[in-house]
């Protein structure tokens, strides 16, 4: 694997790549690129997919600013995040998990630690709203490079318009059938401070250093992540059109 920014969780053994002419199916909108021989990988950062993905997030945020849509999002958020000063708005349930009580206690302890890193009790409303509007919620996992066993030191939010998950595959042509067989693949996150629309190579980040929670909804082509606000685009546009038309109508009929 190439050198990426961020830490890597060492695993006992990597799962071998089984010969196939199609990459694995991902449910997180991962973009697939093919390595270009000795010249490395080529990624069209000005392509339609990257541009549309960023524009789509900006469109969701624009729709969320509509007063009627904003009120609906607030109602959904308030119904989803329920809590008081004495209890946390979220908890992990391990009743049906067939593991020892000691491991369950460890999981609960680490879960509470993550909530403290996110300051979830204070910012649960904002965290849920970001995820609901954008359709994705990325965080950079920051650890102490000199003492990785100390665990996570900080979870830092990343603007999803600047981050994209990429799968880089290397193909080899089968001499018998002529099919292009995937023999190697690398996954990483590509970060660009100026967004995907900017030209140039971005920063490659190891996937273990990024937490990426998505809505789980994909477009019909299963290439882009959709927000729960996607179905609200048309109604909001129609509402704005009616409001603009009403203003023009009143101005036109004012002399009467």
Task: Label every PLM stretch briefly.
Residues 85-97:
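Low-complexity, highly charged intrinsically disordered N-terminal segments
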Residues 1-79, 83, 105-106, 113-114, ...:
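Structured, contiguous alpha/beta core segments that scaffold functional sites
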């Amino acid at each position: 694997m190439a050198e990426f920014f961020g830490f890597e969780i060492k695993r006992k053994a990597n799962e071998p790549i089984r010969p196939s002419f199609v990459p694995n199916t991902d449910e997180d909108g991962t973009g697939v690129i093919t390595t270009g021989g000795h010249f490395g990988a080529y990624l069209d950062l000005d392509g339609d997919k990257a541009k549309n993905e960023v524009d789509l997030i900006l469109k969701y945020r624009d729709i969320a600013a509509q007063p009627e849509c904003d009120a609906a999002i607030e109602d959904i958020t308030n119904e989803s995040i329920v809590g008081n000063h004495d209890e946390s708005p979220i908890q992990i349930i391990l009743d049906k998990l067939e593991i020892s009580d000691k491991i369950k206690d460890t999981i609960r302890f680490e879960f509470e630690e993550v909530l403290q890193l996110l300051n979830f009790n204070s910012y649960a409303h904002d965290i849920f709203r970001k995820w609901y509007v954008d359709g994705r919620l990325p965080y950079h996992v920051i650890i102490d490079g000199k003492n990785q066993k100390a665990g996570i030191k900080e979870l830092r939010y990343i603007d999803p318009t600047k981050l994209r998950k990429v799968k880089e595959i290397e193909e080899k042509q089968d001499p018998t059938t002529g099919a292009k067989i995937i023999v190697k693949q690398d996954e990483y996150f590509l970060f660009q401070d100026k967004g995907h629309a900017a030209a140039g190579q971005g920063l490659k980040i190891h996937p273990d250093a990024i937490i990426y929670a998505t809505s789980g909804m994909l477009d019909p082509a299963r290439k882009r992540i959709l927000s729960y606000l996607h179905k609200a685009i048309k109604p909001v546009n129609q509402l704005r059109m009616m409001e603009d038309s009403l203003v023009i109508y009143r101005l036109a009929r004012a002399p009467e």
